[in-house]
Curated annotation (Swiss-Prot):
Matching PROSITE patterns: RIBOSOMAL_L31 (PS01143)
NCBIfam families: L31, PRK00019.1, PRK00528.1
Gene assigned in the entry: rpmE
Keywords assigned: Metal-binding, Ribonucleoprotein, Ribosomal protein, RNA-binding, rRNA-binding, Zinc
Subunit structure: Part of the 50S ribosomal subunit.
Family stated for the protein in its record: Belongs to the bacterial ribosomal protein bL31 family. Type A subfamily.
Pfam hit, one: Ribosomal_L31
Species for this entry: Nitratidesulfovibrio vulgaris (strain ATCC 29579 / DSM 644 / CCUG 34227 / NCIMB 8303 / VKM B-1760 / Hildenborough)
Gene Ontology biological process terms, A to Z: translation
Protein purpose: Binds the 23S rRNA.
Domain of life: Bacteria
InterPro entries: Ribosomal_bL28/bL31-like_sf (IPR034704), Ribosomal_bL31 (IPR002150), Ribosomal_bL31_A (IPR027491), Ribosomal_bL31_sf (IPR042105)
Lineage: Bacteria, Pseudomonadati, Thermodesulfobacteriota, Desulfovibrionia, Desulfovibrionales
Cofactor(s) demanded: Zn(2+)
Stated name of the protein: Large ribosomal subunit protein bL31
Amino acid sequence: MKDNIHPTVYKATMNCACGYQAEVLSTKGENVHVEICSNCHPFYTGKQRLIDTAGRIDRFRKKYAKFGEEK
């Protein structure tokens, strides 16, 4: 294997916008700032909301239905 091709790995402190901090390994530096983490992400907290896209699909089909018709 080649020598000196791997990036330097630091013990970093990850700081989230929600205030959560964790010790992680990083090649970016010693302080890493993130906007969202597993402590505040809706998927992990169970506060997900479902988005009803049925109306959007119907609008799309109605709008482009005339392009599929033959004259």
